[in-house]
Design a protein with these regions (language model features):
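Conserved ABC ATPase "signature" region
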Residues: 98-114
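Conserved ABC transporter NBD signature motif
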Residues: 47-63
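Hydrophobic anchor residue at the start of the ABC signature
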Residues: 131
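Catalytic Walker B motif of ABC-type/P-loop ATPase nucleotide-binding domains
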Residues: 142-146
Length: 196
């Protein structure tokens, strides 16, 4: 609920291991809000979000360890270099086993910019960093809000290849403005107009 207005209601989702889905809606359709609720970054005014792993509920303060989230509005630390960002993330959310900093930088195709501050990156380069930090993180749930925002055609191909390589068996949900390239992996569709 936002002020006195319900942004969505009667949403009931059961996202099991390996769920692949997309939340579809135009601008202002609250896709981002629903993704934030699923991630537990936002608390719903009514209802609950339950997380379990191996049939045991995950405590609220530990859920962040199991979710990786990418969105164009998520801030990066402007004064950090790419290498510093990767090192910082590893302290609270490790990457998929076997991935070194050098390998992540190589997959990002930003090696010649690795010592440059993020504040000097273009919007497309920043989005690549956000995507790599989320997709290559060791998590059970991957949330992607408008993942191809700010990417040029080459960047969109890179996104698809990276996700195909590192999707694994985890659950993945994208929020999209009906752009097929963002949710090529989806087997399930949620249209927000059904819940408003």
């Amino acid at each position: 609920q936002f002020q006195s207005h319900s942004v969505f209601k009667n949403v009931s989702l059961d996202l099991r291991d390996g769920y692949r889905g997309v939340i579809l809606g135009g601008n202002g359709s609250v896709k981002s809000t629903l993704l934030k609720v699923i991630s537990t970054a936002l608390v719903p005014s009514t209802g609950t979000v339950l997380y379990s792993l191996n049939q045991e509920e995950i405590e609220e303060n530990a859920r962040y360890k199991h979710v990786s989230f990418c969105a164009p509005y998520i801030d990066l630390i402007e004064d950090f270099t790419l290498e510093e960002h990767i090192t910082f993330q590893q302290k609270f959310r490790p990457f998929i086993a076997g991935l070194s900093s050098a390998e992540i930088i190589n997959r990002l195709q930003l090696g010649r910019f690795k010592d440059r501050s993020i504040k000097n990156y273009s919007s497309g380069m920043r989005q690549r960093v956000r995507l790599a930090l989320a997709i290559m993180a060791d998590s059970e749930l991957l949330l992607l809000d408008e993942p191809t925002s700010n990417l040029d055609p080459k960047g969109k191909t890179w996104y698809k290849e990276l996700l195909q390589e590192f999707a694994g068996k985890r659950s993945i949900i994208a929020g999209s403005n009906f752009l097929d390239e963002e949710f090529f992996f989806a087997k399930n569709t949620i249209e927000l107009k059904d819940f408003q």
